[in-house]
Amino acid sequence: MLRDLFVKKKKYAAIPSEQVRKDVPDGVMTKCPKCKKIMYTKELLKNLKVCVNCGYHHPMNAWERLDSILDEGSFREYDKEMVSLNPLEFPDYEEKLESDRKKTDLNEAVVTGEGTIDDMLVVVAVMDSRFRMGSMGSVVGEKIARAVEKAYDLQVPFIIFTASGGARMQEGILSLMQMAKTSVALKKHSNAGGLFISVMTHPTTGGVSASFASLGDYNLAEPGALIGFAGRRVIEQTVREKLPEDFQTAEFLLEHGQLDAVVHRDDMRESLRKILEVHQGGEMAVWQS
């Protein structure tokens, strides 16, 4: 009896059985990659996928983003049926595209269309990093260019939410050409007095950051978003210097004058509404033929 009182405590934790793990369905809980807090996924979704503990902005898919900024039921999609081919016959590219279509229920890495924010009509494009890491191929570039042209025709503002790893390597020079095509479309829109708001989310890199993402009349970003062209390691090896810890973050770019504002997701719709309201009937709304 007395001997039982002095038995050494076990120094290990019991690992739950496979059956116990199966009792918690997939998707019920989400772990924050920043603070490691585990929370109910429903709670996270209710908070616009912003961690309730540390404020980390989890990635949003295209439909979640549209729901968070547009008036309910106002969105009308453009060019839904456009799909990428494999013009360079890159190995396994078609299989990867098909896999992403099934996984995301999207045909490509961007969703474009029109909708309203507080009854103000806008054309909007939202990139979805779940599809080929949001990379820009021929179809992504074409859909964005068409959306800008639609904004030009309707004489309404164009808003884009970027989330991309850059140009799509499987399409080579055809992918790089989209940088010029989208930029030219935006120049035409701008010359006519059209308003363009670019919102950079995590991550916005490569050819996307070096083209249309940085051309906004207003360049906004979400907190903590990674924004840059080349990767940190490549830059450090090139300049042979250690870069600041916050290098290529939205906050770093704001401090160095490359962004107009870093906007919390809770405030994004209201911030866009205010910008649109300021330009209603103003100089930017005077269109030139």
From Swiss-Prot:
Q: Name one GO cellular component term.
A: acetyl-CoA carboxylase complex
Organism per entry: Bacillus cereus (strain AH187)
Q: Which portions of this protein are annotated as coiled-coil regions?
A: none
Name the protein family: Belongs to the AccD/PCCB family.
- Show the catalytic activity: N(6)-carboxybiotinyl-L-lysyl-[protein] + acetyl-CoA = N(6)-biotinyl-L-lysyl-[protein] + malonyl-CoA
What SUPFAM superfamilies does this protein's entry cite?
A: ClpP/crotonase (SSF52096)
GO BP terms, alphabetized: fatty acid biosynthetic process; malonyl-CoA biosynthetic process
Gene symbol of the encoding locus: accD
Keywords carried by this UniProt record: ATP-binding, Cytoplasm, Fatty acid biosynthesis, Fatty acid metabolism, Lipid biosynthesis, Lipid metabolism, Metal-binding, Nucleotide-binding, Transferase, Zinc, Zinc-finger
Compartments (UniProt record)? Cytoplasm
Tell me what this protein is called. Acetyl-coenzyme A carboxylase carboxyl transferase subunit beta
Where does this protein hold Zn(2+)?
A: C32, C35, C51, C54
In residue numbers, the zinc fingers (C4-type) are 32-54
Name the needed cofactors.
Answer: Zn(2+)
Q: What is its EC number?
A: 2.1.3.15
Using the record's annotation, list all stretches that form the CoA carboxyltransferase N-terminal domain.
Answer: 28-289
Its assembly, as annotated, is: Acetyl-CoA carboxylase is a heterohexamer composed of biotin carboxyl carrier protein (AccB), biotin carboxylase (AccC) and two subunits each of ACCase subunit alpha (AccA) and ACCase subunit beta (AccD).
Q: Which GO terms describe its molecular function?
A: acetyl-CoA carboxylase activity; ATP binding; carboxyl- or carbamoyltransferase activity; zinc ion binding
- What is this protein's function per UniProt? Component of the acetyl coenzyme A carboxylase (ACC) complex. Biotin carboxylase (BC) catalyzes the carboxylation of biotin on its carrier protein (BCCP) and then the CO(2) group is transferred by the transcarboxylase to acetyl-CoA to form malonyl-CoA.
Pathway membership: Lipid metabolism; malonyl-CoA biosynthesis; malonyl-CoA from acetyl-CoA: step 1/1
Pfam families linked: Carboxyl_trans, Zn_ribbon_ACC
CC cofactor note:
Binds 1 zinc ion per subunit.
